[in-house]
């Protein structure tokens, strides 16, 4: 056999085999095209002396899809027509006879999903399949991932309105979910791939969320029972408009709500293209209630835009079987972490509930946005699932809580983007300033006491015309 020589040819001049038994779907051709766009055309097409394709029909179709004019080819002229026909079959079938070491494959995919700055699905594996493979590694999730530091409101918060924090691959902004500036600050020109958010339910925390136990929460900054039905609908509508404007076409939005306000959510969601489903979080224990104690919450699954939505479930194709009944324990379940979870936020959602929703409708490395970040469960779930969590939270104390939660669970520190300082540095600075203010206050009080004593002595002297008083009985 003579030495092989690469020759570049126009793919439109190459002739597909009339009896090629290998079928390439349009989806697979798009996948091959994505691979070529990412890695280049690194595998030449095998052709015969008449430019008939021997191996590489899918790559030729992908090259045409990409509009390529020159692709590498190698002419095979040492095989008989019968041998060529046999090789066409062997080239495809022999590759199918190989297997995968699923553990090593999962490790490679897991590391690549962190290292690469593009969709790891370019490897040919679907996102849902990759998530399942990585999940099979059986890595132990840090216990602290479900725990949240208790908020101490007796001390001033470190964060302030307008602060933008970067926490590893995640971004957190302290601001109003109704303000355009908040979204510009946290996202810039990027768009979210998926939304998971838990707006306030427009019910008072006292009597509905916080009962007569030792854990008491202050009311939310907004929509904590003070709004009429019309006002709350307007509030939700404004929120949804902001979320739709900053998410990709075809994105899925998971909106949490209680049964009292189903009507307002549906009335506010008219701009969404579709209500995909209504999921029910079925808790293991009942909470508060009047006639019936509440043992569920609702998650509205809304679609924004007309483009195909991301579906990693695919009716259990890769072993991911999901229904619209989500069974997870609530914080009212008696357990070792119950008090800590209750203390961190009045309406905290289970980490796995949010993580599973993220796995359903987003890709690895994609942006998941939460405009009511609360205790940060969505951002923590994004870290757990290999996504990027972007959050907006109005309450500075909760912003601090999210930052501390990342530090405790994953040892990921936060950097204040406006100053470049870490959260620890800003905390230490606040303590230093507080100490300095305390010393000044002590000095001020000391001077004030000295001044008062001087005034008393002066007043006493004036009362006796400047003469010392004689002691009685002398």
Residue ranges and their predicted role:
Residues 8-10, 152, 204, 422-425, ...:
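Short, solvent-exposed coil/turn linker segments
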Residues 161-185, 403-442:
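S-adenosyl-L-methionine
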Residues 145-146, 358, 415, 429, ...:
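Intrinsic disorder/low-complexity segments
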Residues 2-399, 445, 472-474:
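Core catalytic lobe of class I
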Residues 443-474:
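Intrinsically disordered, Lys/Arg-rich low-complexity segments
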């Amino acid at each position: 056999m003579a030495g092989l020589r690469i020759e570049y040819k126009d793919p439109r001049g190459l002739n597909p085999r009339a009896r090629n038994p290998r079928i390439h779907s349009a989806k697979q051709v798009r996948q091959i095209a994505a691979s070529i766009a990412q890695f280049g055309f690194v595998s030449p097409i095998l052709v015969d002396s008449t430019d008939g394709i021997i191996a590489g029909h899918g790559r030729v179709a992908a090259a045409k899809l990409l509009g390529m004019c020159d692709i590498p080819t190698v002419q095979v002229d040492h095989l008989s027509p019968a041998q060529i026909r046999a090789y066409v079959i062997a080239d495809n079938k022999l590759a199918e006879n190989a297997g995968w070491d699923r553990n090593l494959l999962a490790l490679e995919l897991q590391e690549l999903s962190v290292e690469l700055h593009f969709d790891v699905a370019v490897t040919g594996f679907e996102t849902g399949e990759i998530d399942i493979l990585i999940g099979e590694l059986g890595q132990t999730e840090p216990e602290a991932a479900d725990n949240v530091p208790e908020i101490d409101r007796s001390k001033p918060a470190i964060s302030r309105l307008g602060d933008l924090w970067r926490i590893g691959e995640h971004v957190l902004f302290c601001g109003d979910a109704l303000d355009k500036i908040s979204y510009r600050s946290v996202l810039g020109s990027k768009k979210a791939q998926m939304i998971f958010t838990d707006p306030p339910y427009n019910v008072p925390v006292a009597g509905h969320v916080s009962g007569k136990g030792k854990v008491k929460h202050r009311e939310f900054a907004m929509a904590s029972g003070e709004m009429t039905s019309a006002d709350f609908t307007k509030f939700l509508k404004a929120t949804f408009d902001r979320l739709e404007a900053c998410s990709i076409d075809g994105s899925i939005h998971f909106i949490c709500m209680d049964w009292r306000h189903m009507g307002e959510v549906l009335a506010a969601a008219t701009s969404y293209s579709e209500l995909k489903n209504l999921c029910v979080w079925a808790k293991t224990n009942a909470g508060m209630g009047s006639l019936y104690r509440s043992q569920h919450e609702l998650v509205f699954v809304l679609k924004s835009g007309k483009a195909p939505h991301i579906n990693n479930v695919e009716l259990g194709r890769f072993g991911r079987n999901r229904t619209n009944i989500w069974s997870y324990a609530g914080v009212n379940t008696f357990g070792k972490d119950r008090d800590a979870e209750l203390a961190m936020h009045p309406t905290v959602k289970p980490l796995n509930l949010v993580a599973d929703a993220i796995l359903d409708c987003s890709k690895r490395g994609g942006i998941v946005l939460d405009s009511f970040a609360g205790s940060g469960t969505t951002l923590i779930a994004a870290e757990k699932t290999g996504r990027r969590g972007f959050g907006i939270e109005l309450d500075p104390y909760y912003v601090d809580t999210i930052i501390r939660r990342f530090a405790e669970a994953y040892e990921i520190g936060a950097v204040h983007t406006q100053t470049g300082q870490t959260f620890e540095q800003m905390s230490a600075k606040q303590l230093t300033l507080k100490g300095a203010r305390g010393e000044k206050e002590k000095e001020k009080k000391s001077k004030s006491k000295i001044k008062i004593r001087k005034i008393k002595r002066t007043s006493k002297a004036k009362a006796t015309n400047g003469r010392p008083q004689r002691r009685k009985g002398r």
